[in-house]
Amino acid sequence: MLQLPMSARIRLQAINQHIMTSARPAPSTVAGHLAGSSQSWHGKVVPDGPFKPEKGRYRLYIGLFCPFAHRANIVRHLKGLQDTIPVTVVKPYPKGDEKGWPGWQFPSSDSEYPGANPDPLFGAKYLHELYFKDDPEYKGRYSVPLLWDTQTNTVVNNESAELLRDLQTGFNSILPEEYSKVTLYPDHLRGEIDTISTWMQRDLNTGVYKAGFATTQEDYDKNVPVVFAALNKLEKIIAQHGGPFVLGKDLTELDVRAFATVIRFDTVYVQHFKCNLGTIRHDYPQINNWLKNLYWNVPAFKDTTDFKHIKENYTKSHGDINPRAITPLGPWPEVEENYEKDLSKVPTGGVKMPLVLDLEERL
């Protein structure tokens, strides 16, 4: 999520810059960050590197509202890392302070905003204070997720896509076999995962932001159909593989990537980002059924989802989109129940708008 009260277009550019890989200058730290720049940190926990796997050494800073931080937290749970990597949760709103400093805030107590926590390491009031402790001249965004090394008091990594992958393997040497053997990127599915994740990230995970932060009718009209083309494609993939997961019987990082966006879709993206050509529960029965299974039957997904944080972040921190900061009550229920194990009984849906179908064919 974005930290600066910029225009919608600048915010969208910042999101894309955070997510997409680009050429970087030579690093000046062991975490691959160029001091004094806007570059991200790219450190990795490995047994033979400067960031070794140790219980309690690292802390993960997240926002329960942010889909990209959500992905890292889901992996943390799936790998049984809750006791190994504690988390600190920032408040979903407001952003910045009265002096103009941007970034997310920590509550002063656990009761100030349920689910958010005071910073236990430095008593910081704002997330940007941690970034400046590592690099006082840092010029980038103060984003979550952020993996912090308490031993060296430095940032390890703040790239969500890298943490999604690295948390799967970095602590295997100190985990019991029950969790060390868990992989979301199995060898026999890597090609398919890489292919799908490319368009899923571009058209769905970040596609909703391109639509929601559009500043012209032309941009909005261009980006919304792209989102639904990706949903149409995902609907068919789930049906073709027979469930219960995106690629069939194997739970993979595609499920994590898709869940973090889909769980927010009917709740936020339909109304707040005007992605309203359809809804998950009414137009995508395969995705909706898949969502029910993950949410109700795989604890790592439900346990990391907080709809109050999600809804209030979007509706109360995007003043240009929702100036009165009113948070809608619905939809209800947030996630429907009654998962159907036999996918042959679940119809395959999708949005039939001609432009959406044309874009889907190109994926």
Region annotations inferred by a language model:
Residues 1-363:
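C-terminal alpha-helical interaction module
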